[in-house]
């Protein structure tokens, strides 16, 4: 994994972490159930491991797809961007949520190479 790939994929995790920190600091109603230290540590760890998680998920996914998958399905490349964007957001959010287990898996795989 290159530094460029890591920086490109950590931006979504940083964005989510900054939104979380902003929301817990601007909470005027006294609901601080999400503002625990353990939750903050988990979000910071997930932010750091998010690119590794995405790398591991992509590696596992492409291991099971045949090489001619995208050649046979040419309509996938002609799909409008507006229809793909919600799925990309859900995919990035899934990578962030699963960042700790899959991120550690990605780290193990990278160190193995």
Swiss-Prot record:
This is Colicin-E1* immunity protein. The keyword Cell membrane does not apply. It comes from the Bacteria. GO terms for biological process: bacteriocin immunity. It comes from Shigella sonnei. Keywords: Bacteriocin immunity, Plasmid. The keyword S-adenosyl-L-methionine does not apply. This protein is able to protect a cell, which harbors the plasmid pKY-1 encoding colicin E1*, against colicin E1*. GO terms for molecular function: toxic substance binding. Pfam families: Microcin.
């Amino acid at each position: 994994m290159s530094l460029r790939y890591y920086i490109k994929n950590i931006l979504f995790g940083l964005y989510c972490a900054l939104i979380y920190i902003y929301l817990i600091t601007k909470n005027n109603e006294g609901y601080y159930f999400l503002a625990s230290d353990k939750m903050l540590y988990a979000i910071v760890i997930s932010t750091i491991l998010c690119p590794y998680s995405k790398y591991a998920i992509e590696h596992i996914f492409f291991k099971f797809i045949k090489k001619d998958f995208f050649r046979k399905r040419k309509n996938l490349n002609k799909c409008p961007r507006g229809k793909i964007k919600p799925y990309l957001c859900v995919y990035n959010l899934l990578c962030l949520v699963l960042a700790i287990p899959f991120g550690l898996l990605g780290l193990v795989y990278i160190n193995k190479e």
